[in-house]
Amino acid sequence: MSEKNAYAKSGVDVEAGYEVVERIKKHVARTERAGVMGVLGGFGGMFDLSQTGVKEPVLVSGTDGVGTKLMLAIKYDKHDTIGQDCVAMCVNDIIAAGAEPLYFLDYIATGKNNPVKLEEVVSGVAEGCVQAGVALIGGETAEMPGMYGEDDYDLAGFAVGVAEKSQLIDGSKVKEGDILLGLASSGIHSNGYSLVRRVFADYTGKELLPELEGKQLKDVLLEPTRIYVRAALPLIKEELVNGIGHITGGGFIENVPRMFADDLTAEIDEDKVPVLPIFKALEKYGDIKHEEMFEIFNMGVGLMLAVSPENVNRVKELLDEPVYEIGRIIKKADDSVVIK
């Protein structure tokens, strides 16, 4: 019995793994940017930091996955956007620290290599990288029979960015009187899906719920996470923002206080939050308390900016999109976030 046959009998298809690598090369090529060194398939991805032109570079890194949103991608057999979610979750955290994302690596684990499906996943990763301006410089695809079912897979990513030391955003610049500006989310993004799946467990995904304005439920649930790099980076370069919050798991209540020091409070005007239809549907069909929605979901705001009043107009000028003035920073109240 040859070694190849022995491995195949264990459930690992080496040839399928080679096919995956060949299929994804064209997608990886789309993401190339200045600073990339080496070629796909080496033992390590390489990047020349001197190409960024940053004088006092500070590296900022982030890693994340997409949680149980993957289970809906598998359920609905749609795999070409979930990779964008993975990239977004990493690079949005990096931009919140005032850094420009540079490169990304992905990790896919599956019970059985399906080259067509995995190419779809990586195509979404590449699309996310293009939107974020980062290079996909490496990754790993692990076939793990016995660990995962044949149709199952998990996806995680890792990103690295660079910031000028003087432009780092760590919450220390946010002050009383700052205006809170919200940038719209594209949907649920990639958090809260254990609850989402419970609420819609008995739905096929093809439903046209009245709250969803003519869209099929599955399309709304799998809407990819918005990537905010292109919107936020010019603001960082001009030093127009004092704080940035990526509104992910834990919603407003957990993420907004991460923007500023403990002696401040964010006062949010709920009427100015652009709540998306899917959140109204979740609250209704899931019988979720209204205040709890803000503890779980982004509610329509995926990125929040703390901006000095004198810079608000310039920020709006640079952002070619609706910008929502949803609150302000005040002296410390009983809670770190007050929604009124």
Swiss-Prot record:
Pathway(s) annotated for this protein in UniProt: Purine metabolism; IMP biosynthesis via de novo pathway; 5-amino-1-(5-phospho-D-ribosyl)imidazole from N(2)-formyl-N(1)-(5-phospho-D-ribosyl)glycinamide: step 2/2
The EC number(s) this enzyme carries: 6.3.3.1
Enzymatic reactions: 2-formamido-N(1)-(5-O-phospho-beta-D-ribosyl)acetamidine + ATP = 5-amino-1-(5-phospho-beta-D-ribosyl)imidazole + ADP + phosphate + H(+)
GO cellular component: cytosol
Record-linked SUPFAM superfamilies: PurM C-terminal domain-like, PurM N-terminal domain-like
Pfam families, per database record: AIRS, AIRS_C
Source organism, top-level taxon: Bacteria
Molecular functions (GO terms): ATP binding; phosphoribosylamine-glycine ligase activity; phosphoribosylformylglycinamidine cyclo-ligase activity
Subcellular location: Cytoplasm
Disulfide pattern: none
CDD domains assigned to the protein according to its UniProt record, in alphabetical order: PurM
Keywords: ATP-binding, Cytoplasm, Ligase, Nucleotide-binding, Purine biosynthesis
GO annotation terms (biological process): 'de novo' IMP biosynthetic process; adenine biosynthetic process
Family as reported in the entry's similarity comment: Belongs to the AIR synthase family.
Protein name, UniProt field: Phosphoribosylformylglycinamidine cyclo-ligase
Gene symbol of the encoding locus: purM
